[in-house]
Amino acid sequence: MNIPSDRLYTDTHEWVNVSGDVATVGITEHAQRELSDIVYIELPKVGERFNQKAVVGVVESVKAASDLYAPVSGEILAVNTQLVEQPSLINSNPYGEGWIFKMKMTNPDELSSLKDAEAYQELLQDKE
């Protein structure tokens, strides 16, 4: 399974790619596999503010619906509007074209509570 080492990960299977004070967020390959074919996504609105671990949206698949959580506190700067018409991009390219939103972090210290790729791999192995 692909777990890029240039990102951080949450226990709820979101990934975070940090550039300065901007965090790009998506769901992991593991999460999209568990959900199966993604058919709909409810995106947050640009300008909305969320605290860490708050529900920011929903990902729906043919199997289930799953909440999407803010990995850090911040304000939504951009959402991937391509996902409205093509939610399957999350399945085909979860770490690239399937990114979900970008947020300006208001408390970058919260990044220390996230997992690196190795710790996320261990989390997945513990669940098997």
Swiss-Prot record:
Pfam families: GCV_H. One of its GO terms (cellular component) is glycine cleavage complex. Signal peptide: none annotated. The modification N6-lipoyllysine is found at residue 63. Residues 22-104 form the Lipoyl-binding domain. CDD domains: GCS_H (cd06848). Keywords: Lipoyl. Binds 1 lipoyl cofactor covalently. InterPro entries: 2-oxoA_DH_lipoyl-BS, Biotin_lipoyl, GCV_H, GCV_H/Fam206, GCV_H_sub, Single_hybrid_motif. Its cofactor is (R)-lipoate. GO terms for biological process: glycine decarboxylation via glycine cleavage system. It comes from the Bacteria. Belongs to the GcvH family. The glycine cleavage system catalyzes the degradation of glycine. The H protein shuttles the methylamine group of glycine from the P protein to the T protein. The glycine cleavage system is composed of four proteins: P, T, L and H. This is Glycine cleavage system H protein.
